[in-house]
Amino acid sequence: MSSMDCATFPMHPKMDEQLARTFVINEEEEEKHIQKVQNAFLYYGPYACQRLKRSMDYLNSLSGEDQIMLAKYRGHLECVRTCIDRNQAVIREILRGRVLYPTDEATGDPSEFDEPPPNVRHGDMDQIDIPFDEADVEPLKILKAQSTLKLIARDWSTEGALEREQSYKPIIDSIVAYFKHSDFELKDIKILVPGAGLGRLTYELACLGYSCEGNEFSYFMLIASNFVLNLCDNENKYVLYPWVHQYVNNLRREDQVAPVRFPDVCPLKNPPKGHFEIAAGDFLEVYKTPNAYNCVATCFFIDCANNVIDFIRTIYKILVPGGIWVNLGPLLYHFSDVSGQNSIEPAFEDLCIIMESVGFVIEKSRTGIRTKYAQNPSSMKQSEYQSLFWVCRKPDLFEEQRGKRKASREPHDLIVREDSEEEGEQQPERNETEEKQQLKPLATANCETEIKEQPS
């Protein structure tokens, strides 16, 4: 497919009339926030080089004998500097595509991203020791820019395939099993992916033929995903060094400067079968229409709420009767112990009570799903979650009227560890006729669309 044939994927603010008015009122404030995110990307290089300079300065202060023994280490630090510069060059490419919404006008001269920030001479280590004005750039936001590079590796490189297999495959498999292409017109199955991040899970589901909408609030994610989805025109065109900021737990020098190519799949040249879009906005603010989606898929998302009950209620509301919610992830609870933020941190057994109280039927649940998140595969320190996985169903109207909802169970009855299943154990199959009846309003039977296999 030539570049002229490439599709583009809509990325827009999801809003109703009331929210649109608020959006206009807050547009100036929103632009200031975007500017801070942009500044964090622009100051990525100087900030990373400040850390590098500390190591280099200390190395230069050592005795001549010590420096002789560290000659290869010095060469490695120079290589680190080169990798930081190359990362910054990719970031400038990402920022050239900062316009997220079709209605936006170009934001200034693209060449503004060709040069380092003021007071920094590119390639001159001595000029990196500059003050960071938190009015322009916050160190915490620069760390988020670093994390964004790691997430590009997780979602859009061959090196991230294992993590995607751990996190996305259970979700995809459950959706495919529930919405079989032999029973439904897949293009009529509407799936929402809140917390879509860089969009890979949403893209993979759309490739199977489903109508998929991702939702994301973070401008770090939106800017980067817009670049991958709408501006990358070839596989593995760009090279990042996502682990260059990790100075510890390196077995070999090369592990810190290992390159990662992206994207491993070019969405422009491989457009999905089903409808695919990314909507920007706060999940709780913009998704209020009842009975709108056949499926909600969440991955590493529900613990991003101050009050997880708000997320669960909203998911229940927007699902059609008979629709399902598939979730995988830990309970990190991002606002726990954050100054100025309120937070509740229910355990899984509490979540089971909440889900059933809201009205969900818990069809399947597992614990102990081993999942890593943006980990350097060569690091001596490997962190992983024992994640939760569940499939919940919103009862159809017939069930609610007849009171056929499943009997209440004790929370501990729902806690089944992944490694406790015997090999080959079969799970009870759902009644397929009942499944079709539940989703009949938004799904037409006998779809001829073939399901594309999930990349391994």
UniProtKB/Swiss-Prot annotation:
Null allele phenotype = Viable. Egg chambers develop normally in adult females fed a full diet but show enhanced degradation and apoptosis under methionine starvation. No effect on larvae fed a full diet however larval fat body cells fail to inhibit mTORC1signaling upon methionine starvation.
Result when mutating residue 195 to D: Abolishes S-adenosyl-L-methionine binding but not association with the GATOR2 complex. Unable to regulate mTORC1 signaling
- Which intervals of the chain are annotated as region Disordered? 402-456
GO CC terms of this entry = cytosol; nucleus
- Per UniProt, carnosine binds at 303, 334, 385
What GO molecular functions are on record for this protein? amino acid sensor activity; carnosine N-methyltransferase activity; protein-containing complex binding
List, as start-end ranges, the regions of compositional bias called Basic and acidic residues: 402-418, 427-438
The positions annotated for binding S-adenosyl-L-methionine are 154, 195, 216, 282-283, 299
Q: Which GO terms describe its biological process?
A: carnosine metabolic process; cellular response to amino acid starvation; cellular response to methionine; methylation; negative regulation of TORC1 signaling
Q: Does the keyword Repeat apply?
A: no
What Enzyme Commission number(s) does the record list for this chain? 2.1.1.22
Q: Which residues carry this modification: Phosphoserine?
A: 408, 420
Q: Which UniProt keywords apply?
A: Methyltransferase, Phosphoprotein, S-adenosyl-L-methionine, Transferase
Known role: S-adenosyl-L-methionine-binding protein that acts as a sensor to signal methionine availability to the mTORC1 signaling pathway. Associates with the GATOR2 complex in the absence of methionine to inhibit mTORC1 signaling, but dissociates in the presence of the methionine derivative S-adenosyl-L-methionine; S-adenosyl-L-homocysteine binding does not induce dissociation. Required for mTORC1 pathway response to methionine starvation. Exerts a protective function on developing egg chambers by inhibiting mTORC1 signaling under starvation conditions.
Q: What else is known?
A: The name 'unmet expectations' refers to the loss-of-function phenotype of female germline cells, which fail to sense and adapt to low-methionine (un-Met) conditions leading to their degradation.
Query: What family does the database annotate?
Result: Belongs to the carnosine N-methyltransferase family.
List the protein's name: Carnosine N-methyltransferase unmet
What is the species of this protein?
Answer: Drosophila melanogaster
Q: Which gene encodes it?
A: unmet
